[in-house]
Amino acid sequence: MTDVTLKALAAERQVSVDRLVQQFADAGIRKSADDSVSAQEKQTLLAHLNREAVSGPDKLTLQRKTRSTLNIPGTGGKSKSVQIEVRKKRTFVKRDPQEAERLAAEEQAQREAEEQARREAEEQAKREAQQKAEREAAEQAKREAAEKAKREAAEKDKVSNQQTDDMIKTAQAEKARRENEAAELKRKAEEEARRKLEEEARRVAEEARRMAEENKWTATPEPVEDTSDYHVTTSQHARQAEDENDREVEGGRGRGRNAKAARPAKKGKHAESKADREEARAAVRGGKGGKRKGSSLQQGFQKPAQAVNRDVVIGETITVGELANKMAVKGSQVIKAMMKLGAMATINQVIDQETAQLVAEEMGHKVILRRENELEEAVMSDRDTGAAAEPRAPVVTIMGHVDHGKTSLLDYIRSTKVASGEAGGITQHIGAYHVETDNGMITFLDTPGHAAFTSMRARGAQATDIVVLVVAADDGVMPQTIEAIQHAKAAGVPVVVAVNKIDKPEADPDRVKNELSQYGILPEEWGGESQFVHVSAKAGTGIDELLDAILLQAEVLELKAVRKGMASGAVIESFLDKGRGPVATVLVREGTLHKGDIVLCGFEYGRVRAMRNELGQEVLEAGPSIPVEILGLSGVPAAGDEVTVVRDEKKAREVALYRQGKFREVKLARQQKSKLENMFANMTEGEVHEVNIVLKADVQGSVEAISDSLLKLSTDEVKVKIIGSGVGGITETDATLAAASNAILVGFNVRADASARKVIESESLDLRYYSVIYNLIDEVKAAMSGMLSPELKQQIIGLAEVRDVFKSPKFGAIAGCMVTEGTIKRHNPIRVLRDNVVIYEGELESLRRFKDDVNEVRNGMECGIGVKNYNDVRVGDMIEVFEIIEIQRTIA
């Protein structure tokens, strides 16, 4: 077998050269990549590899799992079973032979050392036991000698002690005799004194009885206390006093004091005497020195000497009652503290964090401020974003007045036919497209030009780098052109002006420059900063120059973005697709958006299930300045919301729910504020007519635009009220809502489903479909105009001059007049003018010509006029006859 190089052997074995060199090194052979390998070395390597393959596993892991059930008692006598699973894991590691020999040697040495230590310990214990026995023997000998000496001393003292005892006994007997004699004398004296007291008491009692019999008056003698029963009577008095005290306490607590106090009196005499006997027995047992402890039913509660300082956690807003509960005080105390600080509040009033902090610190508590958006900040900060920024494509928004050729211009650039697909030839959605040019990529946003789409244009200006302002050369600056300029200036975005329709004969580019200069858009040739490009979307003139101008402006801006890391962007448009669910058009600003990423988007969250570009093709990722449609959100996000990729779906859901709750709180607070501010305006609310509308559209941007346009139509007499709005088709719920609120169902580029149509037919609802916003607004205007009350207008139909005044018994003063203008008609309202000043306004009661009643008198004829309830008519006055006509008003 011939020698081969190591590289050839590596290629033959299909392993890397470095791996093969390492295997040779493990087998004990040093080789480099260019060395040759002999047959013997191959055999050595093969044997080494076989040994490695045959060797068993170095590590063995055993797992054991046990399950048990634990019963936990719960409330209401019910118990709950909890499943407990215990997992144990043990790993055995196989050692190599050399390691095993080394460990065995160490264990043997350790055993020998332990044996040696044990023998030494036994010898030490023997020595200590021998020494202890010797010490005990010596101590025993000492004790025996001491006891012997003690016995000898006791025998010597025994004789002398006996003599002393005899003398003590004699003295004690003499003392006892004297004490007995003294006790006998004392007893006799006490008996004599008691006898004298009894005789005196009997004498006094007989004297009192004799005097009572003499006066024939019976009296109850005062009881004489027996000194022998002193303790018994004392205990009885004490118990009576305690019973009286207890009755007062119990009577004060209960509703009926008399009933409570009378309750112990109902007890029998046996129970009372038993208690008295027990008290007396206890008192007698105590003797003179014994004291019975006083008992009382009153429970004493003392107020804490010092206030308890607590840690009070305060959120961004808190009510006065909640703050009082956290501090464990009454709400009135918190209100008093706020009044001292100069703030008036009720117990249910919501106060801000700063005010609550001042009040809590004033009352001596420690305050812990809690930010409610702490979780949101933590989620947003826990993101991977790359550090290196790279150049990115510019995002260009095309703005301008309606029908000035914005979409057609973009259409020519993209070589597609978008304008023909839009209803009415006007753009009603934001179209996001990116196109490749020879000099780089450009992302275009096409915004609507109609006045109703103000929010869409503002959103486009916020998400863009450069604004291309399209102005028709034959039309000049129009209202939406001015609005687009204002949006661009507010966003601080440079403007490139595209003067379109330059191929028309009536085109006047200089007029466009002059008009734009009035709004601060000056061309470069006039010393300004804006580039002006003459284009024709129809003929394709100047398109390349426009793209070059855009790329030049982008180069000046030095647009950069981070490509690596988690993506972030903005929602350009969103809608609800019946088959795919919520769909959002997202413009990525930085990072890379991948399929499967977890995104947080305003009030919604979800995982990106699919991504499509503007051509409807599936893509797996999208970098900066790339618009894509994403699927998988929990709901339809609002256009303009920030899109952020996060790590944890659970936390994203919590943040989305927090945002929804916060939005609801702000909305309710705003409604409450408006109710308070418009209190007087709402007093006449019943006189205002309302047009209720349930609006459904295909995309979120259209819902916003139509809602804003309709709400702006409201007047003091007729108001438009959007009862409900949303994205998607008209459902049965929408129809039911419209029936309940007497509303008009409006569908913009959507249709009603079968169940909704049944409800609409049964309830006879007004359902209208639209595809052009002009028609929708015009019809709502017409409906509102029908609700307006007509305008009353006074029209002068005749004027007569008073030439003479006659008296009539029936009508009073009659004015003889000459009709100078128009026609005088009977029963019409009139005004009497004197020196061109109205002095009376009333009704024409009588109109005669030659004593005949007539209905009207024409110009140039004489007549007699009687004014109802007015007699102060003079010569030279003018009588003006007018009529009131109704004029139907319309919404402008």
UniProtKB/Swiss-Prot annotation:
It comes from Salmonella schwarzengrund (strain CVM19633). InterPro entries: DNA-bd_dom_put_sf, EF-G-like_DII, EFTu-like_2, IF2_assoc_dom_bac, IF2_II, IF2_N, P-loop_NTPase, Small_GTP-bd. Residues 400-407 are annotated as: G1. GTP binds at residues 400-407, 446-450, 500-503. Residues 93-159, 166-216, 270-282 have a biased composition (Basic and acidic residues). Residues 254-269 have a biased composition (Basic residues). Residues 500-503 are annotated as: G4. This is Translation initiation factor IF-2.
